[in-house]
Structure formats: structure tokens, C-alpha cells
Amino acid sequence: MVDVNRFEYMKIGLASPEKIRSWSFGEVKKPETINYRTLKPEKDGLFCERIFGPTKDWECYCGKYKRIRYKGIICDRCGVEVTKSKVRRERMGHIELAAPVSHIWYFKGIPSRMGLVLDMSPRALEEIIYFASYVVTDPGESTLEKKQLLSEKEYRAYREKFGSSFTAEMGAEAVRKLLRDVELEKEVAGLREDLRMIQGQRRTRAIKRLEVLDAFRNSGNNPEWMVLEVLPVIPPELRPMVQLDGGRFATSDLNDLYRRVINRNNRLKRLLDLGAPNIIVQNEKRMLQEAVDALIDNGRRGRPVTGPGNRPLKSLSHMLKGKQGRFRQNLLGKRVDYSGRSVIVVGPNLKMYQCGLPKEMALELFKPFVMKELVSRGIAPNIKSAKRKIERVQPEIWDVLEEVIREHPVLLNRAPTLHRLGIQAFEPTLVEGRAIRLHPLVCTAYNADFDGDQMAVHVPLSAEAQAEARLLMLAAQNILNPKDGKPVVTPSQDMVLGNYYLTLERENAIGEGKIFSTVNEALIAYQNGYVHFHTRVAIPAGVLKNPTFTEAQNEKLLVTTVGKLIFNEILPTTFPYLNEPSMNNLQEATPDQYFLEKGTDIAAEIKSRPIIEPFKKGFLGNVIAEVFKRFETTETSRMLDRMKNLGFKHSTRAGITVGIADIIVLPDKQEILVEAQDNVDRVMKSYRRGLITEEERYERVVKSWNDAKDEIQSRLMKSLNRLNPIFMMSDSGARGNASNFTQLAGMRGLMAAPSGRIIELPIKSSFREGLTVQEYFISTHGARKGLADTALKTADSGYLTRRLVDVAQDVIIREDDCGTDRGIRVTALREGTEEIENLYDRLVGRTAFEKVVHPETGAVLVSTNELIDEDIARAITDAGIDNVEIRTAFTCNTSHGVCKKCYGRNLATGNDVEVGEAVGIIAAQSIGEPGTQLTMRTFHTGGVAGDDITQGLPRIQELFEARNPKGQAVISEIDGQVIDFTESRDKRELTIQGLSETRTYTIPFGSRLRVQLGEEVKAGQVFTEGSIDPKELLNVKGVSGVQNYLLQEVQKVYRMQGVEIGDKHVEVMVRQMIRRVRVIESGETSLLPGSLVDISTFKEACKEALRAGKALASAKPVLLGITKASLETDSFLSAASFQETTRVLTDAAIKGKSDYLRGLKENVIIGKLVPAGTGMTRYRQIGLEIAGEAPVEADSPVE
């Protein structure tokens, strides 16, 4: 076996017949597999032991030599080598073909490689290879041309005319002869010469031919190797035959395909020996060619060969292709040992870093560790008896198990793993029962709930793996979400409701205005029923010992509620006392207005004050973020556990439930409906009199019902009691929203038909009153659409993530600073007048490209190459600065990655990003994971043409695939002024007067104009509503224009759905789409004109030409969609495992490509550590010193 860590690159090429013979351990001569009586392999057959090795370890076929002591001996009776049976997985055989056969990949692929080398059409080649026409291989003294095709009739005629002075042949032999005659050097030189003169289609064809011929010339592959003389036979263990229960055999399809080839080959040999007539031999040769085609790629040409039940047989190509192929099924994803899965249930009493593992599962997972410990403690004399003890579940093993699992983290994973928080590490604690216990706060990250979800457990084995799990993957470390840097472990549902209820304030609650001397006194008063959580009371500020209080404040009384006193106990001691849900109170100090002088009339003062809002879900998230910012992970995870306990406890105490009596129907609902109906009647009247169009009528009807619903909603919200359970649930952010409530108590409103068009009949009833049959029927459309959408969306979103990961998987932070001389200028993102993303959000965690000074004071707010944190960003926006130039992945010069400075802060940790971080994959996950939350549909706003803007997931796909958008906008190619707009029966035209030229644009009918006569326009500006085609924008505004456009558009879609994603993730993806350039003129470099190359490759070639004083090449940037960009990557392993496996491998083999294993996928495929994180060469030197036999010492999470 090859040691995977020792080689630098992996190369693929065409195999010569000699090479195939050198791999082989013998020729397969017979189609037999195994003997039906003895069930042993037949000699010289497809499973022959002499060729492929013994079926039993250290035992030859005839049984003369058994046992390991005869290792390496070749039996003199049966010729089988005595060795391990494992060699049957690696030893190959071969079949000597009686006639050459063409390889279908090279003849049938698009473009046909054989056709390009020979400059013949694939149709002509097919006729020759499948014995339909003759081809002239040597015209001799005749008037025929070389490579001319002749039918049987013409052949005979020319034979009579010219005799044997010319040679014409058919079949793969003829093609091989032609391939042998190709003079690569001469052809390449000729083509390069031609390229200077020709244009159009001929040029395109010449470029394609040049590419293939040049590839053959440089790679050392010989074109005639595209025709096979010898066929390799893959090892028998890779095409196994197994006995089923009923004595029948199940076999791999490949054996059937090989059998057909051998049968036909043997028949052809016999026919040739007998000297059979030409027509019979030709037919047999054609059948052999078809058999080999079916073996290599069944179904590529003609009807596929079928097995029993008309099922097409799986050929060698199918073994590689698709989700079930070798690449995706076995190389990129393997099943692993030391794993288990079970249903999850909530574990409310766990710490943040713990999970509950069922006893029997833990015992099975940690079996080897327990066995070792049993022996070392002397409880069992040897491993065998230790195993027996475990299998019999003897009581003494439980103590040992507890000892073994302590400090040994396990990984929990929930499918689908959409982002890296879908796998986290926990310390296991043993629990009874058969369900895994999960901490409630990590559910958000896993998107888990307890309605029957299952999770998988994995055990990290090596000391290094355990250390990484503990230091990097522990749930208590993963507080922030990598996509936006906001806490992902915010409390939800019950926990939110409990804390909301606890911090409520109520007017005239029992015991209002009392003064307590200490917190404990207040709690005792509560327990004895003198006050309630919601009661506003006063307490001397000094007794709280809060370091943020001033001297003067400590002397005063603090007005607060009993519930808030309890809530503040969970916060770190150095925090301000939280009395209102405001950022000022959270970050600065408790506002002064809550402190009263001693001796004030407290009760009266409290009565006069308004009620303060309770703490809702969003504010709790801010609290967590602030704690994290100040104290890092350990303190945050402790605080989270306390917040969780408090929430559960008090939502239980509150006993908030929903009853039908909580839904109060609005008394004046009828009036609103009557008014709306009158409105609608008036509209209909106008329509019937022909004052308005059908469109306008429809829009006005829809609008008047929507207004009625909004009116009912706002009145409902006003009329609701603030202590109504349903209101509390929706207001706190625990569950539900205003719209749900309106449907329960107000009216359901308008529904959409399956087409997406809104039905103008409203549902006037609410769920509380009950729907009529017709209303119920209309409702079903929406419900059904919702479910169908969800199912489709999941698949689409998953596929989007897969493409994103593939295109960015080799983007890793590779160096500290790339020294780029460009940045980009960022401003707040706007859509019309609405702000989509403000400047503050865009600056936090980025590196400044230039120093920023305060416009008035001249103070330096941030210097060049300094990281902008929250405080600096706040200072910049407060100073009224509206644009800043920052470093970005767009302009980073690092090849195959990004540098630390251009990337900025790692959002998942809140610190600088480390070298080795796989930012490409994080970006792909951050964009793909919220994909399921995006809508599928195109919004129909009243069915106005041109207003159907694609949004949601389809829009994201359209952007990342760089497709021509639906409803494309017309854009200006020059700066200038709108001087004319004409509209005639068949077209609308807009004229722009530039400095040196005038351009006229045709505006499609039905699209709305966005410019007026006399208006100044810039290049790249839109004239009509709609989306811009990014490829067109690239030609007009260049690379930076299209980068900014894509970033802005992607952000627009996500932000409109309320999803926040850091700009840097989108930047990393867009950078991957625009990494390639198309060579226009090759100058005197080795680049081929018309070829796509990486920017870094192009720069290198130009540098070399400069050094040698040669002519430089010229190129223009190309925008590729993510699928195309993944397939264009330099690594053929990565591309082949993505899509179009056969095409990628065919191409790579001809070019003799080498894969230098730079990305992650390539290394996973060959079984190396990925070159990211601790797998990078620079971190490889770090070893773990294991003292004695103790496990790796890593700080265990503190209680």
C-alpha cells in the first residue's frame, strides 16, 4: 500500500497496452466464474485463484499448502501463491483482445476527442468503428483522399478501378492506423499558424482541436492508446459474487459484462483461426466492440444491455457516477465504527456542555476502553474474559464505564447537517432508558425538536481528536452563529416565556410601593403572598453591591420589581442592574430615573410612572451577546444555564396555558367588514360603468380587503389585555405572532389560489367563530401549497449548499497579509429609500484599508489595516461618515485562499481569524443553511406584467449560477444623457447621448421605465424595472461593478426574509465565481487562445514572458456560475466527485493532469488529513505529550 502522506500529487493519464499488461497477474481466458458443484473458482476464469490470489488466507487452491509458514510459496500443483486473501482486492487480470476496440469515452464524449485529433466528424467515426463504411488509410497512387469514407459499393468500384494500389479498412483498426499517422508537432504548429487568420466557427473548431492536440503533446499520452488492444479486468473482490440463502448467487453486473466480452472475444479468435468469411468476422468484431462499450459505459451508445427484468446493467462508468457511485458513496462519505443513534428527549437539568447517553449505548460505544480498564484494574484476567463480562452485563462494569467516559467527549450530530453547528461535542453522563438527552439550548443550532427526532453519536478516539473536540467543538464554545456572529444559543419558547413573565410589571399589583431592606426580605415577602413578581417595589441600591452604581446612587432607593431582582441574580456581578430592556441600560449603566431619594413618597411616585416593557426574546439575545463580548465562553455558558433554569421554573410557576376563552372576538368587527364591502361595491360599480380597467378593479378590491384586515388587527392589538396568555406568548417571542392572533380572533383575510394569484373573496370568519364550507375550501389551497413548497424547498436548498461547498472548498486562510493595493468602498445597502443593511453592520469585524479621520475633530478613528470592532464602527457612524474603504476577499491576492487581513474577524469566535480556517466551507454553509427559510414562489403582485420579480431561493440560485434573470432589465453601456424616447406600434426606443457616441436601446413592452427625459445616466444604470444580467454588467462596469452587484442582490433576498448573513461569506463565494479569465491573444506564452485559466496561472505566465522579454498574453475576466466554476477547478478529483464524472476524467486523462491536493475534497478522497485547521503543514509539528498513559490534559469546562 502507498503511504498517503508521502506523495505530493496524483496524476491521471491514458494507459498503454504495455502498462495494462504490467498491472495484470495473468490473462483471463474463460468466461466461467465458479464451479457449480465445488463452488470454487474456475481455472483461467473471472475469479481464478492463480491470477487473482487465494480465496482463503494462506491456503492454495488444491490444499497442498496450508498455514502462514508457507507464505510466498507458489504451489507447484495449482500455481496459486500462498498469501492473504486480501490481495483479491488489488490484483488485476487482463483480456488479450483478438481485434482492437475503441474506448467509448474518447470516441463518444462531447466533444469527441478522437474526432478532434483526426479532424473527422463523430458521425464518420461511428460509421468506421461499427463497420458501416470503409476509410481510406493510404491513397497510394489512386485519386482518393486520405480519411475519405467509402460505402461497400464504392469500395468495390474503386477496387476494380485501382486494384490494390490503395488501402481502405474499417473498424477500430483503421482508426488506430489513422491515429498512429497523426504528427502532433506538425499539426499543433499548423493550427497555431491558422488561428492568426481564421474567424468565426472555423476558429472555434481550431481552438478546440488545438487544445486536445496540445494536451496529447504535453502529457506524453499517445493518441493511439484511445484504441484498446488489451482490456484490464478489475480485481474479483470489487465485483463480488455472494451466495444467498436459497443457494442462488448474487453477482455484480460487471461479471455479466466481462463474460459477454470474453465469449465474443473467444468466438472471434476461433473464427479468425478457421479463416471464416470476412462478413462474419466483421460482424463478430462489431459485436466485440459493442460488448466492450457496454462494459465501459453501458447505455452511452444505442440501447443499454439489460439483465433480468429489463434492468440496464451497471457498467464501470456507473460505478463512479452519481450519489451511489464510488466517489460520493465510499470516498467522500464512509460509515464509521464507534457510532450509534437514538431518539432524543429534553435534558433540562444538564449543563451546557453535557449530554445524556443511554447506558447500554455508552457500554457498546466505549467497549474497548472498558475492556482495557477492566484488565488494568485486575477485575478481569484477560481481554477475552473482560469481553465476556461486558456481554453478560455484570454489575461491576458500570463503575468502570463511568470512569472511562469521564473527560471523554462524544460528538452528537443531527441530520441534515446544514452548518458546522450540526455536529457538536458534549461530555456524556450516563442515563437510564434508551433515549439520548439533549440540552434545550442547543436545539436551535441543531434545528432539533423532541417530536421524535433522532441523533447520531460518534466517539473521537485519538488523543488529538479528543483534544480538538474539547477545545473547538464543545457546545459551550459554540455560542455564536458563524453566519452572522450573533448568539445562536438564545433561549426559546418556555424559557423566553418564563423570563418574560418574571420581568413583567403590573399596575396596582399586591403590595405596590413597599420598601424592602434586602433582596432576601423581598423574596420572603413574595413567598408569603405579600407581594407578587410583578409588584413594583423599592430597595436600597447599596444592598445590591453593584459596581456600576455611583456613590450617589448607592445612597438612594432603586425602584424595580421582585421579578427583576430575581432575574438580575443570574447576571455576572460586574453587569449594570437591568431594569429596562434598553441597550443603554445593558451596556452603560442603570438609568438615573429609577433611583429615588430616601424619604420620597414611594407609593405615589410609583403610581405616577408608566409600566416598563418586560424582557423579550430579542433583548435576552442582546444580554447573551454582551456577556459573551465581556467574558468569553465559560461565563456565558454558565449564565445561559442559569437563564434556562429561571425560564423553565417561572413558566411552570406562571402556569400560562391557552384556552378558548382567551380568544376574544372583536366587538366592532362587523362595522369594519360592512365598510369594506361598501368600498368593494363602489369599485365594482365604477368597473361596470367602464371607468376603471379589470386590473385596477382587481387591485382595488384586494387592497380594500387587506386594509380591513389591517384595521381589525390594529384594533385587536389595542383591545387586548396585556396579561392575555396568547398575547404574552406572541409578545415575548415565545410562539406565534400578531397575524396568527388576527386569524384566531379577527378574520383570516384573503387567500392565494394554487396559481399564486390572490382570490378576491375574503374569509371573513375567524377560527374562533368557525369557517363556512366555502371559506374552509379556499383555505385548503394555501395549506397544501405550504406543505408542497416545504418539501421542494428542502431538496433545492440542499443541492444549492452542495454546489456552494464544492466551489469554495479550497478557500482557506493561507497567510497573514497578501499586501494587496486595493480595497472596496462600502456604504449602507439601500433598496430605493429603504435601508437593507446599515453601514455599522457592514463594518464590524472588517479590516480598514485606509485610515479614517473624524470629519470635524480630525481625530484618527481607525488606522490602516486595523480591525474595526463594534466601538470603532459605532464611532464612525456617529461621526456621520457614510462610506469607508475596507479590505475584502474580492481584492485579496492570496492564491487558493484568502489572507487574514482581507477576511477580518472570524464571526464564530469574535476574534481574528486563524490561518488554516476553512472559510470557504463556512461561507457555503452560512449561505446554504438559511436557504430552507427562503420562499420558493415568485410573488405575484396583482398580476401586473414585469412586476413579477423572482425572489427567495430561485433568485439566489439565479445569482450564484450567473443565469440570465427572468424579467431582465435594460442597462446603459455608456455615461450620458437621455435625449429621446420614441414609442411606435412595434417598438419602444430610448436614446442616450454620450460624450463621443449616441446609443439607442430597445425597451421591451410591458416593462416600466426608471429614467426620464433629460436625466443623466451612468454606465451600468438600469433603464427599466427588473434584474440585471451579471454577465452583461461585467462587460460594462468591470469586475468590481459585478462583484458589488452580486453581493448587494444576495443580501437583498436574505434581508427581506429577515435572515442576516455576514457580507464576507457572500464575498468569498462571488470571488470564486470570477476567478477565471479567458485568453484572447496568447502572445508568446504557453497559454492557448480561447482557453479558461485561473487568474493566478495567467499572471504567472505573463511574469515568465516578461522575464524572458517575450510578448505578453491578453485576457478578459469571465463570470462563471457556481456549477461551472466547480467543474473548472484545477483539481480533477474534486470536479469528478461533483458532477459529470466521466467527462471530467476523460478530459483529465488526455491532458495528463496532476492533482496537487490543495483542497479539502481531494484529501478526503485519498484519505489524508484535510489541509485546513490543524491539518495544515504549519501545525503538523505540534504533537501531544501523553504523560504515562493519561489522556490528553485539556481544561475541562468549569462548573
Swiss-Prot record:
The record lists Zn(2+) 1 as bound by 60, 62, 75, 78
Which Enzyme Commission numbers does its entry carry? 2.7.7.6
Cofactor(s) needed for function = Mg(2+); Zn(2+)
Please give the SMART domains that the UniProt record associates with this protein.
RPOLA_N
User: Which of the seven top EC classes does this enzyme belong to?
Assistant: transferase
UniProt KW keywords? DNA-directed RNA polymerase, Magnesium, Metal-binding, Nucleotidyltransferase, Transcription, Transferase, Zinc
The record lists Mg(2+) as bound by 449, 451, 453
Q: Offer a single GO CC term for the protein.
A: DNA-directed RNA polymerase complex
PANTHER family per the record? DNA-DIRECTED RNA POLYMERASE (PTHR19376), DNA-DIRECTED RNA POLYMERASE SUBUNIT BETA (PTHR19376:SF54)
Provide the protein name: DNA-directed RNA polymerase subunit beta'
The gene name reads: rpoC
